[in-house]
Amino acid sequence: MWLLLALLSIFQGTPALSLEASEEMEQEPCLAPILEQQEQVLTVALGQPVRLCCGRTERGRHWYKEGSRLASAGRVRGWRGRLEIASFLPEDAGRYLCLARGSMTVVHNLTLLMDDSLTSISNDEDPKTLSSSSSGHVYPQQAPYWTHPQRMEKKLHAVPAGNTVKFRCPAAGNPMPTIHWLKDGQAFHGENRIGGIRLRHQHWSLVMESVVPSDRGTYTCLVENSLGSIRYSYLLDVLERSPHRPILQAGLPANTTAVVGSDVELLCKVYSDAQPHIQWLKHVVINGSSFGADGFPYVQVLKTTDINSSEVEVLYLRNVSAEDAGEYTCLAGNSIGLSYQSAWLTVLPEEDLTWTTATPEARYTDIILYVSGSLVLLVLLLLAGVYHRQVIRGHYSRQPVTIQKLSRFPLARQFSLESRSSGKSSLSLVRGVRLSSSGPPLLTGLVNLDLPLDPLWEFPRDRLVLGKPLGEGCFGQVVRAEAFGMDPSRPDQTSTVAVKMLKDNASDKDLADLVSEMEVMKLIGRHKNIINLLGVCTQEGPLYVIVECAAKGNLREFLRARRPPGPDLSPDGPRSSEGPLSFPALVSCAYQVARGMQYLESRKCIHRDLAARNVLVTEDDVMKIADFGLARGVHHIDYYKKTSNGRLPVKWMAPEALFDRVYTHQSDVWSFEILLWEIFTLGGSPYPGIPVEELFSLLREGHRMERPPNCPSELYGLMRECWHAAPSQRPTFKQLVEALDKVLLAVSEEYLDLRLTFGPFSPSNGDASSTCSSSDSVFSHDPLPLEPSPFPFSDSQTT
């Protein structure tokens, strides 16, 4: 009843219901439960006390604000199921959730708004009546003016795609002015923008999250009252990813002369939009030659990008000697191509750098000494080469220097790693090129393999017995194999593994992609819920990448094979003898995938193709994410092309990835919830019967798939949170793991058995070639949010 009166007072324009209860009242005002946990909005005046209770039950209820549980003491507190605010302030506005302890079920979803009737003018109010305060002070009427013009000095905002932009126009006046926003001279309300906008009138601001190139333009704030108006314009430029290989600053690294025993720094300034892979190389002489038989130079890799490297653009040489003299190259590559520049280091005896300008005779003497020193340097270099040659032939006990030719494969792509590559890998991801100023940066047609030995990962080829094929991937095939002695703890036993290899007709790009995937897997490390790298075979034969074997195939087929009997839920292949899956088992599948994605997120790896088909299942029903290291050409996606199994990859893509090709961890969160929908439909196909052309417009309008019949509303609320149009409003994988962990703790095997509850609904037969319209039942036609999530996620997430 209290809620009904409050809502009626809001809609009728009367003062909002006072939420303060008298101390003599036996019952404090309580919110009655609302069916389907619909959001409730209450308007509270500034300074007004608030006292609400969560139903009639005092115990077992907790209040949360913006994802954080309220303390039991303080000005704003949650106490014995009550929400109490001593005096309502602007910062108290926001979303409050009352959750049942244990099950974390949402009892109430409440939004408190501040009544700004004293700071804005209604149509039926006389501005003159607002010129005096309640204390009797009279303020002169004044046209609008800027209160903080110094905060508006930055007129041009140039930001990368995916960032958040905030424009502010703080103003004042009497009567209190209103603010409106224009884009390129037209009224701007954000209704056609993916993710919408946030207009914070109390802060005189416009906020746009996850900006894309279509957001470019001139944004004007128009502030006006009855006495006048003022305006100010901002120019927004959204910077797209630059499709260019790294650019090296001219003149760097620079030729350097140093004395023996001094320290030298060589600087290489790299500009690259995509994450560059940088290496410092020293040119060496082998058997009296600087180049191999194939024309590629011999180089020693001195420094490479790794996770702990913060100054990879600087090469430090300590206590240099004559042997350090020579040519050094800074090599930088990204997904587009390679760039490099070289410099010479000259090392002289200390006395040879004692220059003087006292007399012409002294200058001539210095020149003679310099020439003599150069001759001595050449002799030393020759002696050093002979000595090094003797060391190689004599097999001295000192550790040999790692010398290698430039690896003959291209830098296939930018790793999906924001952090840089690990020092554990000695492999240099560069295509074999001749380091000259005239040749092109990339060569074509190279298919020979010349990979350096990586002792940490190399596995003897003769201990690997290949078996039957398991399938074909994007650029190769996967076969089952038996590896003898793969497990160090069981050196006399064999292990079943999967081996990735190239097809017979593979190109040099296919080779580069496989090498790139191998390197990414080295960098990522090990986790229970991802497919882990076990070893590689790079020497004396084709490249083999050895990974864990998942005996039960991919998750989609795993789910479909375990559908309960029925005419509408039939598997494509043979039915599993294990029987249908229970509800806790399905939640466990989602939980394990979320854990794997949380780990990949911690390693700065963006998957970009998360789906049930890319999750593999082991013999022990452990979920393992696969294909996180694949090179994917996101700028050349055919949106209308089906995969080999008939599914459209775009149906798993977030709107910002689909329309603007912006890939972040939050776009992976969107894909994860499509995967969650697949789980609770037991391998169903997303958006069944919806043509791709129509899907685009439906997603822009905010439509989302309906709740699967066998999915609880709590989990569907979780899906809707992850399908938020604004990426920053989606939960992180860490929050998803915590939420699913709570669900697992709350349910038991008796909670829900799919054998008894699966109804006739089957989304598995839909196909993108269908001519069905958007009226199909798979869509919910209410824009977000349809219903709240039961989990207290924060409203703003960082991507």
UniProtKB/Swiss-Prot annotation:
Top EC class of this enzyme: transferase
Record: glycosylation sites: N109, N255, N287, N308, N319
GO biological process, one term: regulation of extracellular matrix disassembly
Keyword entries, A-Z: ATP-binding, Cell membrane, Disulfide bond, Endoplasmic reticulum, Endosome, Glycoprotein, Immunoglobulin domain, Kinase, Membrane, Nucleotide-binding, Phosphoprotein, Receptor, Repeat, Signal, Transferase, Transmembrane, Transmembrane helix, Tyrosine-protein kinase, Ubl conjugation
Observed phenotype of the null mutant: No visible phenotype. Mice display an elevated bile acid pool and elevated excretion of bile acids, due to loss of normal regulation of CYP7A1, the rate-limiting enzyme in bile acid synthesis. When on a normal diet, mice are prone to develop increased levels of white adipose tissue, hyperlipidemia, hypercholesterolemia, glucose intolerance and insulin resistance. Mice lacking both FGFR3 and FGFR4 display pronounced dwarfism, and while their lungs appear normal at birth, they are completely blocked in alveogenesis and do not form secondary septae to delimit alveoli.
Domain Protein kinase: 464-752
Extracellular topological segments: 17-366
GO molecular-function terms, A-Z: ATP binding; fibroblast growth factor binding; fibroblast growth factor receptor activity; heparin binding
The keyword Hydrolase is annotated on this UniProt entry: no
Transmembrane segments: 367-387
Region described as Disordered: spans on this chain: 764-799
A Pfam family that the UniProt record links to this protein: I-set
Compositionally skewed regions (Low complexity) per UniProt: 764-783
EC number: 2.7.10.1
Residue stretches making up the Ig-like C2-type domain: 17-115, 149-237, 246-346
Subcellular location: Cell membrane; Endosome; Endoplasmic reticulum
Modified residues (Phosphoserine): S570
Modified residues (Phosphotyrosine): Y639, Y640, Y751
Subunit-structure text: Monomer. Homodimer after ligand binding. Interacts with FGF1, FGF2, FGF4, FGF6, FGF8, FGF9, FGF16, FGF17, FGF18, FGF19, FGF21 and FGF23 (in vitro). Binding affinity for FGF family members is enhanced by interactions between FGFs and heparan sulfate proteoglycans. Interacts with KLB; this strongly increases the affinity for FGF19 and FGF23. Affinity for FGF19 is strongly increased by KLB and sulfated glycosaminoglycans.
Family, as annotated: Belongs to the protein kinase superfamily. Tyr protein kinase family. Fibroblast growth factor receptor subfamily.
Name of the protein in its database record: Fibroblast growth factor receptor 4
